[in-house]
């Protein structure tokens, strides 16, 4: 028989840098999960990613206080900022442009995000990422 699910916990944790401090500690402590066990497992699983890259994770906590977790791809905004080499997006994206990004870079980001995005084809996903880029104040070049 399947284990009874007690809770789902959604967090964004820096890849390879999970530790018991907030936000991880309080969120998992409330559910009675062994925090250090999660931190070790998460850091081992995100070893291949760039250290410090914010990584969304969904933790399923069971009634017997055991857990499983699924890591997702980093948010599109983070990948766009990294590709464009900027610190933050524009406060006024229609007026102040903060950087440029090429269509090839958008396609690479769409391919990275493909597993987590809903879309029929890579072109639709690229257009979605392009919209995010524009809303951040990035100029898309062909």
Swiss-Prot record:
SMART domains named among the record's database cross-references: RL11
Pfam families: Ribosomal_L11, Ribosomal_L11_N
Coiled coil stretches, renumbered: none
Record's GO cellular component terms: cytosolic large ribosomal subunit
GO biological process, one term: translation
Reported modifications of this chain: One or more lysine residues are methylated.
Keyword list, A-Z: Methylation, Ribonucleoprotein, Ribosomal protein, RNA-binding, rRNA-binding
InterPro entries named in the record: Ribosomal_uL11, Ribosomal_uL11_bac-typ, Ribosomal_uL11_C, Ribosomal_uL11_C_sf, Ribosomal_uL11_CS, Ribosomal_uL11_N, Ribosomal_uL11_N_sf
GO MF terms held by the record: large ribosomal subunit rRNA binding; structural constituent of ribosome
Complex formation: Part of the ribosomal stalk of the 50S ribosomal subunit. Interacts with L10 and the large rRNA to form the base of the stalk. L10 forms an elongated spine to which L12 dimers bind in a sequential fashion forming a multimeric L10(L12)X complex.
Family label: Belongs to the universal ribosomal protein uL11 family.
Summary of the function given for this chain in its UniProt record: Forms part of the ribosomal stalk which helps the ribosome interact with GTP-bound translation factors.
Protein's name according to its UniProt entry: Large ribosomal subunit protein uL11
């Amino acid at each position: 028989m399947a284990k009874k699910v007690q809770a789902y916990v959604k967090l964004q944790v820096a890849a390879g840098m999970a530790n018991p401090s907030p936000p991880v500690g309080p969120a998992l402590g409330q559910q009675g999960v062994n925090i250090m066990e999660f931190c070790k497992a998460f850091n081992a699983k995100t070893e291949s990613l760039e250290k410090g890259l914010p990584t969304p994770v969904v933790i399923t906590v069971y009634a017997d206080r055991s857990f499983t977790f699924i890591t997702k791809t980093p948010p599109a905004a983070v990948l766009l900022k990294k590709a464009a080499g900027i610190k933050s997006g524009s406060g006024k994206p229609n007026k102040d442009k903060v950087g440029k990004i090429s269509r090839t870079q958008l396609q690479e980001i769409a391919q990275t995000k493909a597993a987590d995005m809903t879309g029929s084809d890579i072109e639709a996903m690229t257009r979605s990422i392009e919209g995010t880029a524009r809303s951040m104040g990035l100029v898309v070049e062909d």
